[in-house]
């Protein structure tokens, strides 16, 4: 578990999940797939040589199978590997709505970003978590602590990861990110692990800065100048619409609407002469999914001691008990010329017209 915790994000490229969504998607993979390739490839020898834990030496002949670590870092199955039962019950501690990863990044990112996400009683959640015959289980006495934690995750998501300025930067980066990485990496990371390992935020920003300062290649120079504009926060997209809804009133199917679908429906509701205007959209349920608690698909297993019974709850169902608002849809444009037409179209698409 210590090794899996240490290496669970080893497959991340520069700019984390943005890299997944705007480069790795080309091959239908994500950082977990790359991480597994690293763990079972270049790192396998190092993992296999470990002979002790912080508490004691391993028994004679006892070693860590790198496949155990690779299995734990992702919810998808590891091809050709049948996990022993003891390993399968450990995975939810690293992958799930109240995983160790989630309980680590919420207070950490809240502190670093200067955003008060509210109290998070991690110790109570840990105290009342146990392994039952059904897997990782949370005693109902910790239910309120879990609600606080999920609410803090949602608050942090909207105030930091899905903040309007963050998303404006993301929209602008999306235009230059893929061609930049193609020049620096040159293909599928699984086929270029050596290059992938040295590709970091620092190396990327250093390279594009050099391009902007006078590359002989026109494409590199243009990309470098575009990156320089982002770094200087010369942002071209402006937020002109944001649709909110209460968690308990999320429209049926809203969480499955993609950016492309929302944009297409908006164009259908615009006057014919405006259907080709430039705008960008954001859908909270589809963007930054790794940090979005609304997109959790795993059930949480609760134990009810008075009834000696178990019940399963989806995260979204738990949110519907909380008085929280969610920003689901946004529209960005380079200016406000067609602001009222876009707002009218958005209200019609979302069924908010009065």
Region roles according to the model:
Residues 10-354:
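Histidine-centered, transition-metal-coordinating active-site segments
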Residues 1-5:
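Active-site alpha-helix of zinc metalloproteases
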